[in-house]
Design a protein with these regions (language model features):
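Membrane-interface elements of multi-pass transporters and channels
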Residues: 72, 95-103, 121, 187, ...
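Divalent metal-coordination and catalytic microenvironments
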Residues: 93, 128, 158, 246, ...
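Short active-site segment of divalent metal-dependent hydrolases/proteases
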Residues: 96-97, 135, 249, 269, ...
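Functional transmembrane helices that form membrane-embedded active or gating regions
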Residues: 256-275, 284
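Non-catalytic, topology-defining segments of multipass membrane proteins
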Residues: 2-87, 114-224, 287-371
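Juxtamembrane helix-capping/reentrant segments at transmembrane boundaries
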Residues: 100-119, 140-155, 253-265
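Transmembrane alpha-helical segments that form the membrane-embedded catalytic/substrate-channel core
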Residues: 83-95, 120, 124, 174-179, ...
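Long, highly hydrophobic alpha-helical transmembrane signal-anchor segments
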Residues: 77-109, 130
Length: 371
């Protein structure tokens, strides 16, 4: 199944056909397009040195912690591994979007090691690229990363299941309960996998994971400890970033948040807190998201209808006990009425775009992840 990122604003967008798929950037205006092009001509940006340095830091830090854990001590090693494992998941996302190389197979190689344990890189890639169809963003039957349920599915849930969803939709619940629900859904997906490509991904993933656990055991570090004390908390940290990252809105460009988080979170999540910018410019490298956001902060505030938050602490205070209203999807009728505007064309040669989304697309079928 081909994965497409759709162009919503034809006048202010520039397409590029990469790996047989037309991707699109949604610029605020022509001036922003020119500014992004100028930034893209910078040698440092084009060299992708920040991403190469990031890979060295993440891999070096992760394996260094395991090798020298007895010197560091178990407590410090655990804390550092939580950070490096979370960082690795952020790096995998960057690899999916075509960085640091133009070769998807090479990028896949950089992200295939199961340092985060829970899912194969290829399945995450396919699911995430389907998520980037902005015109169906948040829709339960179309967006594999949505937390919304269809009204029919919501009505079928038992009262205790609805209460569980409400609990998950609080900030503490998303961190504590969210990873468990995701893991259960992932295991269910693995057991029900029938597609040969998906089965192959799981076989490779589990084989590599077994080898990684064996090596870890040889270093004297318990794989069980790693799963419980490192991998689960790391997955929980990613739930901080994704908490209320999207909302159901009629306008597709108003469905993604811009979270003005503090620098430690920005670094850990590779600036994906500027999520509206990322969805508008999916090929922009992580080190460009904040710069572009700050240059056009007011424009993005207007574009996404004020969906902006001052940091993750604001979500914590607002949704410590109160659940965010992400359960039954309310529906977005405007998209259905204007679906012709979101038809991707994969036949034509690329235009000159400074930052096309060089996402990999070599899987046979999109694999959905339950949310």
């Amino acid at each position: 199944m081909f994965i497409t990122v759709i162009n919503h604003l034809a006048r202010n967008s520039s397409d590029s056909q990469v790996y047989g798929i037309r991707m699109a950037n949604d610029y605020i205006n022509a001036q922003q397009r020119e500014v992004v092009h100028q930034l893209g001509r910078n040698w440092l940006w084009r060299s992708e040195l920040p991403t190469w340095a990031l890979m060295v830091g993440v891999y070096g830090g992760w394996f260094g912690c395991v090798i020298y854990w007895q010197t560091l001590g178990l407590f410090l090693t655990t804390l550092l591994l939580i950070v490096f494992t979370t960082w690795y998941m952020s790096l995998q996302h960057e690899l999916i979007h075509g960085h640091p190389t133009r070769f998807p197979r090479l990028n896949q190689l950089f992200g295939t090691l199961p340092l985060a344990v829970w899912y194969p890189y290829g399945l995450y890639r396919d699911s995430h690229l389907a998520h980037h169809r902005n015109h169906t963003l948040t829709e339960p039957d179309e967006d594999p990363e949505t937390y919304y349920l269809s009204p029919e599915r919501w009505a079928q849930l038992k009262p205790w299941q609805q209460r569980l969803i409400h609990l998950r939709n609080t900030f503490p619940g998303r961190l504590l309960l969210g990873p468990l629900l995701d893991i259960v859904a992932t295991l269910k997906m693995m057991l029900l996998a029938r597609d040969l490509a998906a089965v192959a991904m799981w076989v490779i993933h589990l084989t590599l994971l077994g080898g990684l656990f064996y090596w870890m055991q040889q270093q004297g570090l318990s794989p069980l400890w790693f799963v419980v004390a490192v991998s689960y908390p790391a997955l929980a940290l990613t739930k901080i970033r994704s908490f209320y990252e999207h909302r159901a809105e009629e306008a597709p460009l108003a469905r993604s948040v811009n979270n003005e988080a503090a620098w430690p979170w920005r670094l850990l999540f590779l600036n994906l807190n500027y999520h509206s910018v990322h969805h508008d410019l999916p090929g922009l490298p992580w080190y460009g998201l904040r710069k572009v956001y700050l240059l056009y902060r007011d424009g993005y505030h207007q574009r996404n209808h004020g969906f902006r938050v001052a940091g993750y602490g604001e979500w914590l205070l607002r949704f410590w006990r109160k659940p965010v209203n992400v359960n039954a999807h309310p529906g977005t009728h405007k998209d259905a009425q204007h679906a012709d505007h979101f038809t991707a064309d994969v036949r034509y040669p690329p235009s000159d775009d400074a930052w096309p989304d060089r996402s990999a697309n070599d899987a046979a079928e999109t694999t959905r992840r339950a949310g």
